[in-house]
Amino acid sequence: MEKNSNICPANRVRQVKEYYFSKKLKEVAQLNAKGMDIISLGIGGPDRPPHQSVIDTLCDVARRHDTHGYQPYVGLPSLRGAYADWYRRWYGVELNPDKEIQPLIGSKEGILHITLAFVNPGDAVLVPNPGYPTYSSVSKLAEAEILTYNLKEENGWYPDFNELERMPLDRVKLMWVNYPNMPTGAPATMELFQKIVDFGRRHNIVIVNDNPYSFILNDNPVSLLSVSGAKDIAIEMNSLSKSHNMAGWRMGMLASNAQFVEWILKVKSNIDSGQFRPAMEAAVKALSCDGSWYAELNKVYAERRKVAEAIMTQLGCTFDKSQKGLFLWGRIPEGEESSEKFADRILYGARVFITPGFIFGSNGERYVRISLCATEEKMLEALSRIKEMK
């Protein structure tokens, strides 16, 4: 485009920045093109395949001539039923598959659909600090006011409810929570979820729990919807990306009361045209996996976690060994200027990419995150490189 063009982007485009990983991975790609062979421990994208039966189902259904057309906006009945069975079996939550479940093209899109369904320009949204950056960026796109609430190490990375009660809550429509937490690894508990639901009910705030990590290095999967009456004011998003190694398949869902689901569908049905039927039928198969699937998955992650802990220790970082999920979160040494400079020094000095915590908010500034989504062999090589770093 010529520099003197009078065409400008919408104001909302000026409100958000390019996603950190989108920009940083370009830098990593440039380094790789120069032959630096960067080991990436940054992204939480599982490197292992789904169960073989899931892949077989995808291929078998894709070979049929009648499975390539548009599909229902609400997903296949069999998929909604499989999600309901999954919630009943693993979380002890009863859901009406016809009215209380909406499949998503990955749970990330649900952040947009939920925000557009509930938030008007000028409304306020409670967003955790540190937290997933998309909660804030989507709120900005919706022209909402962002109210960040603190998560701090001294409070176990849980909300300070006394502090929350002192915040200006009269215009708050949504509160984003994410337990088991990313990036901190703080676990979900029924006590925590009860407090969150009580807070939402007290202030007429819709609570949204983003719950993709509950099966990773976690013996007790818990759902916010397990709290009595939670469905009245709460929505939970879930995903097969991490729990079933299906990140690129974009298979997610949300669950809530029938009215909330209907409102969200009004938005969603005007944005996309459903999901690929072979992928949905394969997801049904994935959701039927028994406990041995999760046990084998976690056996692999447990071994990688040991190496991640060794890397953190070598870097002089401190960390909580009780963390859940797909990452390890650690506090950088006091002498380091910032998490960004610390991570860049490792990137250029050891050719290992880890995530600086500042991207998750100001409360993440003194922290870094290591992903478990690299082979144990690669992680051991990363450890070796860091040991040799000057």
Please place each PLM-identified region on the residue numbering:
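Active-site phosphate-binding strand-loop segment of PLP-dependent enzymes
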Residues: 151-219
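Conserved glycine-rich beta-strand-loop-beta hairpin in the small C-terminal domain of fold type I
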Residues: 284, 300-309, 319-331, 364
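Conserved core segment of the aminotransferase class I/II
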Residues: 229-302, 306-315, 389-390
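N-terminal small-domain helix-loop-helix segment of the aminotransferase-like
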Residues: 2-106, 113, 286-289, 390
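PLP-dependent enzyme catalytic core of the Aspartate aminotransferase-like
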Residues: 85, 165, 336, 345-355, ...
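Conserved PLP-anchoring active-site segment centered on the Schiff-base-forming lysine
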Residues: 117-139
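Helix C-cap/helix->beta junction micro-motif
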Residues: 34, 142, 202-203, 315, ...
